Amino acid sequence: MDRIFARFFCFLLIAAVSHAADLSPEQYWRSILPNTPMPSSISQLLNYPYLPAVRLPRRTDAGQRNYKSSVSHVAERSHRVDDGQRNYKLSALPATNELPHRTDAGQRNYKSSVSPVAELPHRVDDGQRNYKLSALPATNELPHRTDAGQRNYKSSVSPMAELSHRVDDGQRNYKLSALPATNELPHHTDAGQRNYKSSVSPVAELPHRVDDGQRNYKLSALPATNELPHRTDAGQRNYKSSVSPVAELPHRVDDGQRNYKLSALPATNELPHRIDAGQRNYKSSVSPMAELPHRADDGQRNYKLSVSPAAELPHRVDDGQRNYKLSVLPATELVHYTDGQRNYKSSVLETPELLKDPDMALFFLEKNLQQGKKINNALHFANLLATTNSKFLPRGKADSIPFSSKELPEILDRFGVRPGSDDAAEMSATLQDCELPANKGEKKACATSLESIVDFVTSSFGASDVDAASTVVLSKAVESSSLAQDYTVSGVRRMAGTGQLIACHPESYPYAVFMCHLTEATTRAYKASLVGKDGTAVEAVAVCHTDTSDWNPEHAAFHVLGVKPGTVPVCHFMQPDAVVWTRRG
């Protein structure tokens, strides 16, 4: 009878395992943990990626994220609208060399093309100034000038040549083209500020004119120059150009802030460099290795674009906090996950950079976890995994992929990661961390699937009646809530269960991998309601370690909090992408 019962039990076990293998990760959760709601840190990772096109952000500090992703060689590159006023659209299609169109406050537009008949950029500043420069070789027409809508200077030195047209009083139009039939250009000095100099014939000197000691026109006839007008307005604007085959078109400095340089060299397609208030710079070229515009806005935003096959798409720094890096390489991108709490035995003597990690702000003293207390740590709660393609793989798929340091070359090849790269180093570090033995009094495992996490939790607790909790940002008052800020505790409650708990932290890897560890019995878990300085509401999970006597005296937490091992409980908040498990009851 016992033998029959044993065989029947084995049959049921095999049937259960076979049935579980047919379940999706979400279904597996519900079958094993029917009374445990799934936290957002887990549910956000249930959409499976198509390997190997997976990527994760590199997190270097709280609120300062670096995102890398890959795009195909024919992909359309980043579209950006800033304050509804600036639009950048750059296409990497090999059939076109069109450079970016830009509208600033609905007033400035840059459009350029490097085809032989292309127009160089049109610019409208404050809806009043228009610059149009044509590279057509069929004309040398130079500007006519009207100042205050009252003065018109027009001269001609050949049947074909016209000089410049100009409208002043904030309504200036420059049109320059380049017939080789004339070299005549005006010299003009207005209040000692404007100067035009050009040449018209081998022998002739044209009249000098002084009007109120302010305007001087001198036209000389040196045959060796094709220099176009130099103009200085209030010591601030300078135009210099040449119509020779290697000539440069005008340079312009407006209030010491804007510079335009356009070259008519047949061998170059370089478009204008622009500096606005010392802050914006555009440089572009569509040669095979050329860079597209660099832009710095208020010293905070930078765009760098290249159309070469290995080029980088724009880097953007917004308020010094977020950095986006997009690569056209198909290689997998990873998250650089820095968690100041993962290794409780870490030493700042061995890794002094830990003290600079913004996650150190997550440490606090348990006595401050009271209603009305202010956490003056400039906290930032960042859910990195929510914006990436790093998802859980079904256990069958995850188990089929090697996961050990010895097999790193095969793993890198599988995910298209170049050996020796930063991503390869991150993956290697994750594998080594997972292979380290657990700390004293702990049990740990690296789970490569959601099913593996569930199995680790239930086997460690010996029960399936558990709670899972993650930090959740409930509301953001304003966009600036992404900044690190002080929070005030509006409520605290102890999480159900006593004794040991399990904490799971995400690791740097192409797909979702969590390091889970069962902590000592001397830990307590809390849920704290926090309100930020700007009104942001956060339901934060906090873990307190009541016995730190065996911690490394050089642990970063002791330096941050100014305490010694074994004296007071050391607590830390959990980031939204981590999970804390407790036994219910």
Swiss-Prot record:
Expressed in leaves. Residues 1-20 form the signal peptide. Transmembrane segments: none annotated. Residues 63-82 are annotated as: Disordered. InterPro entries: BURP, BURP_dom. Disulfide bonds: none annotated. Keywords: Signal. Residues 363-584 form the BURP domain. The keyword Ribonucleoprotein does not apply. PROSITE patterns: BURP (PS51277). PANTHER family: BURP DOMAIN PROTEIN RD22 (PTHR31236:SF2), BURP DOMAIN PROTEIN USPL1-LIKE (PTHR31236). This is BURP domain-containing protein 17. It comes from Oryza sativa subsp. japonica (Rice). The lineage of its organism: Eukaryota, Viridiplantae, Streptophyta, Embryophyta, Tracheophyta.
